[in-house]
Amino acid sequence: MSKIYINPGHGGADSGAVGIGGRQEKDDALRYASAVADKLKAAGHTVELERNADYLINVKDIAKNANLWGADLFIAFHRNAGGGEGAECLIVTGASATSREMAQAIQSALVGVGFRDRGVKVQDRNTYVLSHTTMPATTIECGFVD
């Protein structure tokens, strides 16, 4: 079984995107990440959930913590904003084949439960954690808050 490091995006004073009715990305990210962490643990994986409450962790510390913990895989949970729909997984330029395969497998699973397919995308802005972790890594953008 794998050691999987899960990061619920944003937290604390950093709400991330804010949607209709004040819905905050940080709250959804924590809820989704916690649910996935529970499922992965039940399947026999060892999981480290970066935060389990509403506080902010610096991106440099997130990458450092995942690396020091010795994770086999890193997954960050976020939400999109800007008036679209669907889910996408992000990887960085030069991502490993395993990162690409993991992102594609997650993307396929999201589409399988009803998300519109926005694909696996290469993104190099605001990706400090993905580019500074030593294990295969992806960010999941789980739909839009708005």
Residues covered by each model-derived region:
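Active-site-proximal helix/loop segments of hydrolytic enzymes
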Residues: S2-K3, D27-D146
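Short, surface-exposed beta-strand segments enriched in small/polar/acidic residues
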Residues: I4-A17
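Glycine- and acidic-residue-enriched helix-capping/strand-helix junction motifs
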Residues: G16-R31
